[in-house]
Regions:
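Structural marker of alpha-solenoid helical repeat scaffolds
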Residues: 1-2, 35, 69, 102-103, ...
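Conserved alpha-helical positions within TPR/SEL1-like repeat arrays
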Residues: 7-18, 27-30, 40-52, 74-85, ...
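Terminal, low-structured helical/coil segments at or just beyond the last alpha-helical repeat
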Residues: 162-202
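TPR/TPR-like (Sel1-like) alpha-helical repeat modules
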Residues: 132, 136, 140-142, 146-176
Length: 202
C-alpha cells in the first residue's frame, strides 16, 4: 500500500487500467491528485481512464488543466485531440494533433492522426504528403500505411492501395477490423469508410 505516495497511487492506477479496472484506476488517480495536486501525470492518467469510459467532458477538463500548466505537453495535446475527434470536432482535433507533433516531431502517431484528420476534412493533398513522409521515415509504421491505403483507394489508385495494404496485413492485422478502428484506434469516419470499401473492393 502507498498511504502517502502520489506517484505510487498513480502507477497503481495505470496498472489497474491495463487490467481493465477502469473505475479503480480513476480512484487511484484521484488519490494521487489529492496528495499532490500540482503533479501533472495523474491528470493525464485519469483522463485516459475517463476516455476508456467515454467520459469525454471529464477527460477534456483534465487535459485542458495540464495544458494550462504546460502548453507544450504533447501527451495532453494528443489526448485532447483524440477527445475532440471522438466528439466529431475534427477541425479542433487537427489543430491539436498538429501542436502535439510540433512539440514532439518524433511522435509518429500524432503525425499520422494529423494526416487522418486532414483526410476527414478534405485536405487530401496535405494528408497524402504527410503520410508519404511518415512512411519514408518509418517504413514499418502500419497506421500511416493503412491510412495511405484508404487515401489511395479513394483517389482511384488501386495498385498503390494494394501495395501499401500488403505491408499493413503483415505488420498489424487489426486494421481490417472496423470496430477496432472506430473504438480503439479511433480513426475519423471517412478514412474508415474508404478503407472498408477497399477491403470489400467497392
Amino acid at each position: 500500500s502507498y498511504p502517502d505516495d502520489a506517484a505510487g497511487f498513480s502507477n497503481r492506477g495505470n496498472v489497474r487500467l491495463v487490467v481493465g479496472d477502469v473505475k479503480g484506476s480513476i480512484d487511484d488517480q484521484n488519490k494521487a491528485i489529492s496528495l499532490n495536486p500540482s503533479e501533472i501525470d495523474p491528470y493525464i492518467n485519469r483522463g485516459i481512464a475517463e476516455e476508456a469510459l467515454g467520459l469525454w467532458s471529464q477527460a477534456k477538463k483534465d487535459y485542458m488543466f495540464v495544458i494550462s500548466l504546460d502548453s507544450k505537453n504533447f501527451s495532453a495535446l494528443y489526448n485532447l485531440a483524440n477527445v475532440e475527434g471522438s466528439t466529431s470536432h475534427w477541425d479542433k482535433a487537427r489543430d491539436l494533433f498538429s501542436k502535439a507533433s510540433l512539440y514532439n516531431p518524433g511522435f509518429a502517431m500524432a503525425r499520422s492522426s494529423l494526416a487522418l484528420a486532414d483526410f476527414q476534412l478534405g485536405n487530401i493533398d496535405e494528408a497524402e504528403k504527410e503520410l508519404i513522409k511518415l512512411i519514408r521515415r518509418y517504413p514499418t509504421f502500419a497506421d500511416a500505411r493503412a491510412a495511405l491505403t484508404a487515401l489511395n483507394w479513394s483517389n482511384g489508385e488501386a495498385g498503390k492501395a494494394e501495395s501499401n495494404w500488403i505491408a499493413v496485413t503483415e505488420l498489424d492485422p487489426r486494421y481490417s477490423d472496423e470496430e477496432w478502428l472506430k473504438k480503439i484506434r479511433r480513426w475519423p469516419p471517412q478514412p474508415i469508410k474508404d478503407l472498408m470499401n477497399f477491403i470489400d473492393l467497392k
